[in-house]
Amino acid sequence: MSISFTHLGTGSRGNSTLVECGDHKVLVDQGFSGKELEKRLARMELKPTEIDGILITHHHGDHGSGAAISQKRWGIPIFCNDRTASALNLDLSKTHLFESLEAIEFAEDFAFLPVPVPHSGADNVAFVASHGGERGAIATDLGSWTEELVTHLRGCQHISIEANYDQKRLWNGKYPVRLKERISGRGGHLSNDQTGAFLSNVVTPETRSIV
């Protein structure tokens, strides 16, 4: 039994990743409408009622806008930190709140570790899934990488990480300067070069796939 990662969608229109381990199925982020999630899961021959839980990285709409409807319509447990739960107006009686660097266990040997990452206006985390000696990570929407993140992702067999823009194209583009500064700042997103530098610090012979 191993961990598998399937990206149901990424980008400003919505993000969600299906993580499977044996009979367990967990989503990282749910930035889609209920109807759209049903459609994307159907491609995997799955229904929302088969999902064991949804982990939310942060409250921005493209990552968490579908959490409340998933909670209400299908009763899927939502796992997030306090700030994210408040921003998404989740039912706290049905929401599992976590603290960074405290493992979230879905089975005896299948867990997720939330690792804090910098992102503007959000209490954002990356997630490291583990099963036995196997580990896989999802890190999105971070303006810079930290040594703490390097420590937890080094040697992961699978890494999903953003590479959001080319610096030259960004600064030569037509965006307002203020927006360019926000995108490239510590609270924005990783550039292609930053992601490359990060990966040079975490990839080992054990790493099998990078998305």
Predicted segments with their positions:
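Conserved beta-strand hairpin/beta-sheet module of binuclear metal-dependent hydrolase folds
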Residues: M1-M44, N124-D141, H158
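Active-site neighborhood of phospho(di)ester-bond hydrolases with catalytic His/Asp-centered motifs
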Residues: V28-G31, I51-H59, F79-D82, A137-D141, ...
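Active-site glycine- and acidic-residue-rich loops that bind
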Residues: I138-V150
